[in-house]
């Protein structure tokens, strides 16, 4: 049986791998001037990190999170039919998103003591969700994101959105083809009453709505705004709106965010039905869509002022966002663009006889030590076959070493496009190559 990748996963090779690397480079170039520093968290966390942070009632925790068990613990789970008897440190999961893990790092290491400098971090990591694989939805996918803890001011919300749109611009998006949606989800003071209003609205229309929405009425009624059923969406269009139920503090926070965005020239659309799928969001939420690309949201985020406390820390404001690599790449391609990284020009060193391989080996090492991408023959090909291989790997130059050239202390340097050819001194081969790349 031929080995195959798991369903819902992709191999990042060639141009796609270079695109992922380029996205990470762009992320560093955009986020670091704002004071953000790179962070990497474990792919495996204790389940409670996500249950407390994302929310027990969310689809991510209930339906999509991959659980991880060692051999012995897996046997116990199969035998007992539950993992509740395992110790917390034995109940593990693959991270489905980045924020909860970063917050766990902050809480565990006390990185935002009261009155300290805010904690700013960005990440580029693989995430895992047990979703039904389809276009733009994978079981292992990649995200670039930022987390800003210790910044309650609405200016931080606006600055995150400004960073996000600048990131899309650097990726190669025409921002006029993107749509930024914003909303406020209120906070612990005003959202509970609103949640009850939406719950009652769904119950009043239960016989008209899908099974999933009826289930959500008890667990997470606001998620009904995200239902993909057209009839449910029509019904939810008449539901009470958070904007009509904001407390004075949340309303003023939201208005200030909009004023900052207006001052920065950021175009946005207010969407009073916009909710995020994770329970930790408070106040400002935002998403970026690529209409016409067929991939839905390509990124989003918001404020999460209660998450640090949920993870066992002291009350600390937070805000952040994440961008899906695979979806962003699909959207770019739909718009006729790409994220292909510029490859360094390649040099191929060919030998005119097996007896010259040692000399070719020395030349390749010298070129590589100088940072020049260099290929050579390792299969005993003929000179003609080496020329074909040089063309196949996209070499800009081919260096040909024959017995006569070696005796004269020279090497032929040939441009693969123009076919211009010169003899260069072996003692000066690096400079000769650089002049022609």
Please provide the spans of the model-predicted regions.
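TRNA-recognition modules of translation machinery and tRNA-sensing kinases, especially anticodon-binding
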Residues: 1-437
